[in-house]
């Protein structure tokens, strides 16, 4: 007789808080990991962008140049540049090492909610309350965008890029996917204003959160509804959602001070992680490890799995 195969190790969830960082930049509007997960960015209501080593709790650099609160930021694949967008309607390209502004892109008619680099970091994509997604060439000296995607009927809340595709979520209740190779746009109607969108890490699905306190997992190509996830509260604010590092769990901020984790396949609630008493404004999931950053008020929290032991006692 054959012995049963050992079960693969269940994915661990980041439920142990290792650090809380007081960011000293007013309210933290967004927190983002860099490409390899060693550093993070925080966007402040005080117009600054800050770069941290979250495990050590050290501030590495402050980037000043926005005229109003910073709402989103992203790092390039080689860690040499950052981009950010904010309430001053501008998109800023930064040199990481010097802290200097490389370019300021102006053209949006309202605040910039969301920014992303393409995979080569040659183009910045920005989504604005003005209902447009604009594509800015980082290498060109021309002031105008190389492309404007203006199909949305209301503000853009979320933009994600994957290979040759752009995913844009709008307050008009639609998620639009632009296939740049084919020159096509497809649209999925959710009905409720979209707060966040993302691709699954395997590229097969899209995750959508909206103001009806529901997350939906769709088949990227067919638009088929694969799963719905409820239990959290999202009725007023633009909150982040994502998938865990192995696509096993759906993760979302909530207005009741928790972060919710659902089993992707079962749809069942796996964990409601208590962060604090206010809205969990933003979150970021590590690209390779069960590691989570959350933002609440003026601070960020750093979470790892229960079995995690920091090397050299850094935790």
Curated annotation (Swiss-Prot):
Q: Which family does it belong to?
A: Belongs to the WD repeat MORG1 family.
Question: What is one Gene Ontology biological process annotated in the Swiss-Prot or TrEMBL record?
Answer: response to hypoxia
Question: Which InterPro entries does UniProt cross-reference here?
Answer: G-protein_beta_WD-40_rep, WD40/YVTN_repeat-like_dom_sf, WD40_repeat_CS, WD40_repeat_dom_sf, WD40_rpt, WD_repeat_MORG1
Q: What is the lineage of its organism?
A: Eukaryota, Metazoa, Chordata, Craniata, Vertebrata
Protein purpose: Molecular scaffold protein for various multimeric protein complexes. Acts as a module in the assembly of a multicomponent scaffold for the ERK pathway, linking ERK responses to specific agonists. At low concentrations it enhances ERK activation, whereas high concentrations lead to the inhibition of ERK activation. Also involved in response to hypoxia by acting as a negative regulator of HIF1A/HIF-1-alpha via its interaction with EGLN3/PHD3. May promote degradation of HIF1A. May act by recruiting signaling complexes to a specific upstream activator. May also be involved in pre-mRNA splicing.
Q: Which GO CC annotations does the UniProt entry carry?
A: catalytic step 2 spliceosome; cytoplasm; lysosome; nucleus; spliceosomal complex
Instruction: Tell me one Pfam family matched here.
Output: WD40
**WD repeat windows:** 23-62, 65-104, 107-146, 151-188, 190-228, 231-272, 275-313
Tissue expression, per UniProt? Highly expressed in testis and brain. Expressed at intermediate level in heart, liver and kidney. Weakly expressed in spleen and lung and absent in muscle.
Q: How is this protein named in the record?
A: WD repeat domain-containing protein 83
CDD domains with a match to the protein in the record: WD40
